[in-house]
């Protein structure tokens, strides 16, 4: 009876977490449509996402402590690990129980990248001429002088000798890159990789002397990179990651016939 009640409690937490994720997705979709329709952005979207994040985080903690109470010996550490990873860290970075938390984070980061990218893609100034990017580079280079420059000398050299002569190419990469990163994070497709490229752009903006939302979005992007195993679970990564696998553990799409035959013999199933 006790185990049945515990299972019902776990199911309830799971469904409530999923409900928060659905609400965050609908709210973010509305925000994106509203912003791309040339309406002024408001703070209600961010405030609502913060509330949803706190609720999802509280539910994730509840699921963690519930799992620990039901299965205290579930987490086993390798004998050669000098500093075993704490159970709570393993839960948030590798357990699907924390996927709703990362889903809310994805909605925030993905929407920021998608709206920023769409604004650039739809602007002629960010086209092949590289007009907007050239102006951005010029403003950044102006910050590279003085005793404590906001833009370091080596990065100013990179902007002047690499980016500026190829402004059209970099304009294309930045505008479409931001759009692709936003879409990838929102739909949860190779989320860790998409977030990694996003963090790379955040760092470049910061090195150019532009603060804006880059520290916050960059920090959230790093969290998505660290939690790559589970942050896209409520998304396409639930299918893509098992199919693609890892360099040291190929997925179903890259398994050899011998491996498939071995798995079939071990499981007793055949096609």
Language-model regions, residue ranges each:
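Extended, low-polarity transmembrane helix blocks
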Residues: 1-177, 187-271
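Transmembrane-helix motifs of polytopic, lipid-linked glycan transferases
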Residues: 180-184
């Amino acid at each position: 009876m006790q185990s049945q009640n515990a299972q019902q409690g776990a199911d309830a937490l799971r469904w409530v977490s999923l409900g928060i994720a659905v609400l965050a997705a609908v709210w973010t979709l509305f925000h994106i449509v509203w912003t791309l329709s040339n309406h002024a952005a408001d703070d209600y979207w961010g405030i609502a996402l913060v509330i949803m994040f706190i609720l999802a985080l509280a539910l994730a903690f509840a699921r963690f402590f519930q799992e620990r109470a039901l299965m205290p010996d579930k987490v086993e550490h390798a004998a050669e690990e000098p500093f075993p990873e704490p159970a709570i860290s393993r839960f948030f970075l590798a357990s699907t129980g924390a996927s709703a938390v990362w889903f809310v984070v994805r909605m925030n980061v993905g929407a920021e990248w998608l709206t920023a990218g769409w604004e650039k893609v739809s602007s002629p100034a960010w086209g092949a001429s590289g007009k907007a990017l050239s102006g951005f580079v010029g403003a950044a280079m102006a910050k590279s002088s003085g005793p404590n420059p906001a833009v370091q000398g080596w990065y100013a050299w990179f902007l002047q000798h690499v980016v500026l002569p190829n402004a059209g190419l970099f304009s294309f990469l930045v505008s479409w890159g931001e759009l692709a990163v936003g879409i990838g994070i929102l739909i949860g497709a190779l989320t860790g990789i998409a977030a990694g490229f996003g963090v790379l752009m955040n760092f470049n903006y910061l090195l150019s002397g532009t603060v804006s939302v880059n520290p916050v979005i960059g920090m959230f992007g790093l969290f998505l990179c660290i939690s790559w195993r589970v942050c896209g679970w409520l998304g396409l990564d639930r299918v893509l990651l098992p199919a693609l696998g890892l360099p040291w553990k190929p997925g179903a799409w890259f398994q050899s016939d011998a491996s498939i035959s071995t798995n079939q013999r071990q499981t007793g199933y055949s096609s």
